[in-house]
């Protein structure tokens, strides 16, 4: 049984047995976040079905020649870091997931390394106030400016990136 089916079944059973009330669900579920997640997944699925990530990967491989796995990993991590700081971590994941799937299917990177690189890159949101929800949460009340995030986040971004890439390098075959 897949996870979604089990989750829906457990929720329905909890509702039928009176363990879960609809009012509690409405109050405790972040519906805005759920909307963003579902939209991002829909976008990601449409992108994968279009074949664009496979074409982009083929173009990249033809343009760059034979690159090592660590080079592909660094490119993935940097692209995800830029996307997560420019958009948000969820948007970065949704946009780059199809490309990572194409990289895995094309034999460029092993799946574990590729998806960890994507996840860690999407968490590297230290440069802007809108890259991650917590950054935005303290932005206004703390009286910070965007330049403060850039100034304080640049060192963290490089340190975090170095640690992640060194770690992931050991997972490469």
PLM ranges: what are they?
Residues 1-6, 86-88, 108-111, 173:
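Transmembrane helix interruption/hinge and helix-loop junction motifs
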Residues 7-17, 118, 122:
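Pore- and pathway-forming membrane helices of multi-pass small-molecule/ion transporters and channels
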Residues 10, 15, 21-106:
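Membrane-embedded alpha-helical segments and adjacent helix-loop junctions characteristic
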Residues 16, 46, 103, 162, ...:
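Hydrophobic membrane-targeting alpha-helices
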Residues 69-82, 108-127, 171:
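Alpha-helical transmembrane segments of multi-pass membrane proteins
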Residues 112, 119-173:
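Juxtamembrane and boundary regions of transmembrane helices in multi-pass small-molecule transporters
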């Amino acid at each position: 049984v897949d996870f979604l089916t089990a989750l829906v079944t457990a929720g329905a059973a909890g509702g039928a047995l009176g363990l879960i009330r609809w009012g509690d669900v409405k109050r405790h579920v972040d519906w805005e976040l759920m909307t963003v997640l579902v939209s991002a997944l829909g976008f990601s699925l449409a992108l994968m079905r279009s074949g664009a990530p496979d074409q982009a990967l083929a173009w990249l491989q033809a343009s760059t020649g034979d690159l090592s796995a660590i080079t592909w990993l660094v490119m993935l991590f940097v692209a995800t870091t830029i996307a997560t700081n420019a958009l948000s971590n969820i948007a970065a994941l949704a946009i780059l997931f199809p490309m990572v799937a194409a990289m895995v299917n094309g034999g460029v990177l092993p799946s574990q390394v590729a998806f960890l690189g994507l996840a860690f890159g999407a968490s590297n949101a230290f440069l802007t106030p809108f890259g991650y929800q917590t950054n935005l949460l303290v932005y206004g009340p703390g009286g910070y400016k965007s330049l403060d995030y850039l100034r304080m986040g640049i060192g963290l971004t490089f340190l975090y990136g170095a640690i992640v890439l060194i770690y992931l390098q050991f997972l490469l075959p």
